[in-house]
């Protein structure tokens, strides 16, 4: 049994994903649209992702002292992934999404993980943008999240500090108000961050214009609020 056959069995026979089209949000979809998404992702994974496994052995990423140099195949794969619409597949039509059931989106994205997990960082961007869509301001959604969904920007994980791990109450990074007018910033209060963070996947690269880092930090106000954790969105512009 091929991977596609296994995936279709799990999706349609076990999870009964077709039944989701009876819900109002997914009423525009059919088995045919679900299959079309699977077809597209399977093709991109085969043509753009799978060859990367050999290429990366020959053209290893490197740091030239100023920037990270990646194989050209990295750019081509990420461009194809963004063009497919999978970064925003489950989002509302109004923000450029397909209103695809997340079950189908996750199944389709598994083709990329199977083909080359080392290049499959698009899920980090989607997760980053999803966080902003839930907790961000309207302007933050417009400036950050929508540009991530389009592939113009990329995003990283919301990671902790080397000594803290998952114990967020132990982080030591502080968010210090940046000037007396720090709350006047249209995109949200502006802070200076003091501390360290663990940058992991997609932390520095060239394929996108900006990288959005969600950075947890404590906001020093009063002793009673010392344990309050805020989340700052950092925009990093990369030199081409």
For each of these PLM feature ranges, what is it?
Residues 91, 96-99, 103-106, 112-130, ...:
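FAD-binding core of FAD-dependent oxidoreductases
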Residues 39, 76, 82-86, 149-153, ...:
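Short, well-ordered loop/turn elements at secondary-structure boundaries
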Residues 16-17, 114, 133-138, 150, ...:
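Short, well-ordered loop/turn and helix-capping segments at boundaries between secondary-structure elements
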Residues 12, 90, 109, 158-160, ...:
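Residues in well-ordered beta-strands of folded domains
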Residues 104-107, 136-137, 171-174, 207-209:
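Short secondary-structure boundary/capping segments
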Residues 189-240:
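A short core secondary-structure module
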Residues 1-119, 139, 143:
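Amphipathic, small/basic residue-rich leader segments at the start of a protein or domain
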Residues 61, 124-125, 136-189:
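Internal maturation/activation junctions in enzymes
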């Amino acid at each position: 049994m091929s991977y596609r056959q296994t995936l279709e069995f799990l999706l349609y026979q076990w999870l009964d994903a077709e039944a989701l089209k009876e819900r109002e949000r997914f009423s525009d979809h059919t088995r045919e649209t679900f299959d079309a998404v699977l077809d597209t992702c399977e093709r991109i994974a085969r043509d753009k992702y799978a060859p990367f496994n050999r290429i990366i052995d020959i053209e290893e990423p490197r740091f030239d002292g100023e920037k990270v140099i990646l194989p050209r195949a990295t750019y081509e794969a990420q461009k194809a992934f963004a063009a497919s619409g999978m970064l925003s597949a489950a989002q509302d039509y109004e923000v450029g999404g397909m209103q695809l059931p997340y079950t189908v989106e996750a199944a389709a994205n598994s083709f990329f993980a199977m083909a080359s997990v080392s290049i499959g960082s698009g899920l980090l961007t989607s997760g980053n943008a999803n966080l902003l869509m839930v907790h961000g301001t309207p302007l933050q959604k417009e400036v950050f999240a929508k540009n991530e969904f389009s592939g113009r920007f990329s995003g990283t994980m919301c990671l902790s500090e080397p000594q803290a791990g998952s114990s967020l109450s132990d982080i030591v990074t502080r968010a210090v108000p940046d000037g007396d007018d720090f709350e006047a910033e249209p995109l949200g209060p502006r802070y200076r961050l003091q501390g360290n963070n663990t940058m992991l996947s997609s932390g520095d690269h060239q394929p996108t214009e900006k990288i959005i880092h969600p950075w947890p930090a404590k906001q020093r106000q009063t002793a009673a609020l010392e344990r309050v954790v805020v989340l700052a969105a950092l925009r990093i512009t990369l030199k081409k």
